[in-house]
Amino acid sequence: MDGRARGGPTPEEQRSTSTDVLVVGAGPAGSSAAAWAARSGRDVLVIDTAQFPRDKSCGDGLTPRAVAELRCLGLGSWLDGRIAHRGLRMSGFGADVEVAWPGPSFPSTSSAVPRTELDERIRLVAEEDGAKMKLGAKAVDVQRDSSGRVSAVVLDSGEAIRCEKLIVADGARSTLGRALGRQWHRETVYGVAIRGYIATPRSSEAWITSHLELRSPEGALLPGYGWIFPLGNGEVNIGVGALATAKRPADAALRPLMNYYTALRRQEWGFDGQPRAGLSALLPMGGAVSGVAGPNWMLIGDAAACVNPLNGEGIDYGLESGRLSAELLGLRDYSRAWPTVLHEHYARGFSVARRLALLLTFPRFLTSTGPLAMRSSTLMKVAVRVMGNFVTDEDTDVVARAWRVAGRVSRRIDHRRPFS
């Protein structure tokens, strides 16, 4: 609903809340943005549909890049009390490879924390920094002034929250993003995934595990992987994820696939019982959305499809994009500035990652390259580094330079570039 000039306030406007910065969504991206904005002295209000703590479909993995962002937020001591993972164990096509996290630009360990705990802890950081919270409130629409700027966000209760600046972090489906004109383009790869929790005596292992040869109960090779992430609390996060496009939709029932994957690993891991708390998700990836910014609003995190197409990771991108969006709040207009920031930080990597992920949706590509790749420890070290988003602009080694060149070339030939 677009705002219009009126002679006086409506009853809804008379009872509306007003804030400088309104953040919609209290997950890692939204709470990160709120914390950094509040630290700069701004008046910040965060709203979220859920009451916290709340669960979220996720592998719970915190990459070294995510660990670095959490430490910047002041959560280093909290993380020190959580499990630390040395690297990634990959299995498939008749081989097993362990690759330590590569560094040196990021911490040497990763972690895994259930989202019920992680999201609440980051939200509390934002609250401790001065951000106000309004939980159990769903944003469904916006009001705009004559210049196209968002003047208020409308809740499902009818209440309007007036704001000068708006950061949208309401997740992959992004109800408010759609109201603002966000479009998801499914011609590039997206992900479908499901996870659960299961007890095991190996819950304190120092390696996360990915099975790259994911097969259906009928034996068909699927474009995806299964994972087991030790949580250090007596359980692991176990799940399966598959890649898809509009032309090649995922042809797998997720819950039966997770149960089958669990059965395959039961003896090896000593699983007790069946996976509990199963949750599935549909994930736009690699910046496959347009309409990520307007005059006074920005989409961040999953709402902006800031998800790695090669591994489905989104927490590190959410934390980073929250911080980066807060740094732009002093600008008058975000329409071009925010897409430019997203392009500078993520477009090269997303472009080439989308192209590689698309190849994985072709069974012949997997069967021909999988066995060769798994038998080369050097190649798998490179794969872990680029798949994990561990290449920075400051890195000058051969792998970093090659990855950046590949990203630039890929972006030039994109039919639709990331975030456009």
What is the meaning of each model-derived region?
Residues 67, 71-121:
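A conserved beta-strand/loop capping segment in the N-terminal third of enzymes
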Residues 327-420:
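C-terminal helical "tail/cap" subdomain of flavin- and related membrane-associated enzymes
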